[in-house]
Amino acid sequence: MVCTGYATVPHALLMTLCKRWHAETNSFHLPVGEMTVTLDDVTCLMHIPIEGRMWSHPKKMSRTDGTDLMVRHLGVQQAEVLKNCNEEYGGYISYKALREYYEGYIDSATRLSDPKNLGDPQKLERVLTAYVKSYFLYLVGCLLIGDKSNKCIELVYLTTMEDGYAGMHNYSWGGMTLAYLYHCLAEASLPGDRALGGSVTLLTVRNCHI
């Protein structure tokens, strides 16, 4: 799943669909009639929950707040986080840096769980927790709520993990994915806009079933 996203979908198809999108009805106006993406499509094609709390963040997260989230949830040293959180863009991290983090956690967990050289079990648990959270954040960016730059993900999504794994299940990830896709399609349908954010994977798969 981490290999999907904006870089792997047919851009010409997406831009053609954007030209057909009408924000007033949240639907595509095609020669054969109207079509849209529904919550039923989300749950059937992506198998993510559509029930639960909706979540939004109207303000862009600052670099300072994003750094605090990285330190608290992913166990990264503050000095290292500041290198990867650009001052200009605030609380964002690149896919490349995030991928390096979770791949590093995999290597650390493998060493700590080696029967021939068992490490501190509490440290192993912290490493595994950081791995799951960083991988989840990567999936959110690649599959569900992608940035139109196709380069980075907002660190604010780490706040959905404040209550642990059980708390993450309380959110309607399907509902948020669809709402954000509608928003991105409305922006991309405007004259002069040539980029599309949101779950382009969902949009592509849905249109393969027309």
Tell where the protein language model's regions lie, with residue ranges.
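N-terminal leader regions that mediate targeting or early regulatory function
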Residues: 1-182, 198
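Compact beta-rich and alpha/beta scaffold cores in large eukaryotic transport/transcription complexes
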Residues: 169-176, 188-201, 207-210
